[in-house]
Amino acid sequence: MAPAPPPPPPAPAPAAAAPAPPLMTGDRSALLNSIQKGKKLKKATTNDRSAPVVGGGVVGERKSNTPKSFAAPPVPTGAPSLPTSSNNTQQAEERPSMPALGGLFAGGMPKLRHIGKSSASAAPPSAPAPPTPQSELRPPTSAPPRPSIPPPSPASAPPIPSKAPPIPSSLPPPAQPAAPVKSPPSAPSLPSAVPPMPPKVPPPPLSQAPVANTSSRPSSFAPPAGHAPNVTSESPKFPNRGPSIPSASVPPVPPSSYVLQQRPNRVDDHGRFHFKDDSYLPIPHPFLGVPKVYRGGSGTTVPLNLSSF
């Protein structure tokens, strides 16, 4: 008999039920349904306040009807014209609107001014100043010029004193020319011409002969007696500068003990150079006409014969 067929496989177990979808709120379900249906979302606008504000507005704003406040005024031409508010308004309206720029140029492109011109380029050039006269260019003086002092007239000149002025005390008395010893008439003229000196000033040197003559003269020519002792007691002694006083003869200078002597010219033949006879020289070796053989340092076949030396 044939074997029985195998039993059929058991039936598969029933499939597990799918998990239930989570409960959704009404707002989320509506948004999800709109996304699933393909509805376009509304584009969001972002107000970025981090950009710099230039010209009174935020960067990115367009001002089509308002004039650019950051633009520089036009450069003045040869014919000066005063800028007015109406002219600026007309120029701003006639100027075509430029596309808005971002960053620092949002208010408009600034114009660079030339070097050397003032910042207020719109101001009209001032009229040239009139030339200043030469009289105004001179600086004002603090005081009027003083008139030059006229030279003194001969009548107002002081009279020339007949006597010599007194010698100042700070300087030593100059040497006065003394009269010669053998001329007695010149002695009385000295007291009359020279006034009495102050007590602290030394008297000028006088020769001995005039002093003796003045003592023999009357007392009217002599100086006051009250001043004489003061002059001699307080005046220092100065060396006499006058040639009239005979000075002591200077002793002759004693002869020096050192006397120059002429040395004889002699030749010292035996001092530096010595010239001697040939007999003092050593005896030279006798000359032998025999050829000598010297041994080389690198070796030679010639034997060394010491008897030949």
UniProtKB/Swiss-Prot annotation:
Consequence of gene loss (knockout): Grows normally at 25 degrees Celsius. Displays morphological defects at high temperatures and is cold sensitive. At 18 degrees Celsius, becomes rounded, characteristic of a polarity defect. Synthetically lethal with deletion of myo1.
Segments of skewed composition (Polar residues): 82-91
Domain WH2 positions: 27-44
GO molecular function, one term: actin monomer binding
PROSITE patterns (UniProt xref): WH2
Transmembrane segments: none
Record carries keyword Thylakoid: no
Region Disordered, residue ranges: 1-273
Intracellular or extracellular location(s): Cytoplasm, Cytoskeleton
GO biological process: one example: endocytosis
Ranges annotated as biased composition (Pro residues): 1-13, 141-207
GO cellular component: actin cortical patch; cytosol; medial cortex; nucleus; old growing cell tip
Chief location of this protein within or outside the cell: cytoplasm
Assembly and interaction partners: Interacts with wsp1. Interacts with myo1 (via SH3 domain). Interacts with actin monomers.
Main function: Involved in cytoskeletal organization and cellular growth. May exert its effects on the cytoskeleton directly, or indirectly via proline-binding proteins such as profilin or proteins possessing SH3 domains. Plays a role in actin patch assembly by enhancing the ability of myo1 to stimulate actin polymerization by the Arp2/3 complex.
Similarity comment: Belongs to the verprolin family.
Name of the protein described by the UniProt record: Verprolin
Source species: Schizosaccharomyces pombe (strain 972 / ATCC 24843) (Fission yeast)
